[in-house]
Amino acid sequence: MPEAKPGLQLELLELLLVGAGAVPGALLRWQLALYLGDQNLLVNVLGAALLGFLSGLPAAPRRQLLLGIGFCGSVTTFSSWMLAAVKHLSAGDWAAALGLIGLTLGLGLGAAALGFNLGRRLKPPEPPQSPT
């Protein structure tokens, strides 16, 4: 991840990378919703796995901007997930709301951990530190 900058000062390349990842992510999300219906669970779990994988790879700030923040950030959706839970709650279906929240959290955490560990396996081993 790039180092935080004061205020909202951004580099043009950083903006372009995030936008270049966000557009296909949002379009994919839209198409998945059209063809699969409301599949927040599937999309969020797959997005968590991909983001975990990317984060487990050797550091590459530009890749993280493009694919992590841009693509994964726009293909996954926290707000739609919460709205689905609220709809269950407003219908009086507490079990479905809590089940959706618990299932998404559990599967999402597991998917992120799996992706992260897979990404770390591709990372070259660190050279041993010599005692000084």
Curated annotation (Swiss-Prot):
Activity control summary: Na(+) is not transported, but it plays an essential structural role and its presence is essential for fluoride channel function.
Reaction(s) the record says it catalyses: fluoride(in) = fluoride(out)
Chief location category: membrane
GO biological process: cellular detoxification of fluoride
GO molecular function: fluoride channel activity; metal ion binding
Sequence intervals crossing the membrane: 8-28, 41-61, 66-86, 96-116
Matching InterPro entries: FluC (IPR003691)
Subcellular localization, as worded in the UniProt entry: Cell inner membrane
A single Gene Ontology CC term: plasma membrane
Membrane topology: Multi-pass membrane protein
Keywords carried by this UniProt record: Cell inner membrane, Cell membrane, Ion channel, Ion transport, Membrane, Metal-binding, Sodium, Transmembrane, Transmembrane helix, Transport
Record: residues binding Na(+): 73, 76
PANTHER family registered for this protein in UniProt: FLUORIDE EXPORT PROTEIN 1-RELATED
Similarity annotation: Belongs to the fluoride channel Fluc/FEX (TC 1.A.43) family.
General function of this protein: Fluoride-specific ion channel. Important for reducing fluoride concentration in the cell, thus reducing its toxicity.
Protein name: Fluoride-specific ion channel FluC 2
Source species of the chain: Synechococcus sp. (strain CC9605)
Biological classification of the source: Bacteria, Bacillati, Cyanobacteriota, Cyanophyceae, Synechococcales
